[in-house]
Amino acid sequence: MLTKDLSKKILKSDVDVENSVPDEPITMELLKGGSFLKRAIGICKRNLTRMNMIRLMKILRDSWIWVPCRVIMSDTDYAAMEKLVKDAQENGGLDSLVGITLSNQDNIRMIPDILQKGDEFFFPVFSSAEEMCEYGERFSKIEKHFLEAANLARNNEKNVKGIVINAFTEPFVIPSELFEMIAGMPSNFGKNRSV
């Protein structure tokens, strides 16, 4: 049984803890950089209520996230890039490549990574490129709208269970069953800004 003193201590310790995802108007400025999304996810991890989840889904509807991808290029393009790097090493170092624009001969494919936990597969996305930590060093990073990432996850050859946001810091899974619901929510930016 909680005593009156213990109840007061518990309430006092929660004074600075947010328990509700903010219901303020969502703006591009608010979503920029991913910190608002990260904050909303943290609140949902502490206090997963129906209202918090709905507010998070509204935020996701208009959010841009980061997707780790493997770059697949043709043998011709790969050989050209290897030659460029080799020439740079022989003629002053890799710093000489800074600012150089590369043109490819063939199509370059960006293949999103898939994480596996037991028999389940998850599509990883991140609120910012920094949230990828060391994991991100092995991949190219592309910024995508959340709805585009949901389509990539849904159409993946693996049976993806959901999208895991910030998998290596504060992981939060958006189940694949919610993708359609999020896509059906109205954009906070009107028709001109939606995907």
Task: For the regions a language model picked out, list residue spans one by one.
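An interfacial alpha-helical scaffold signature
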Residues: 1-195
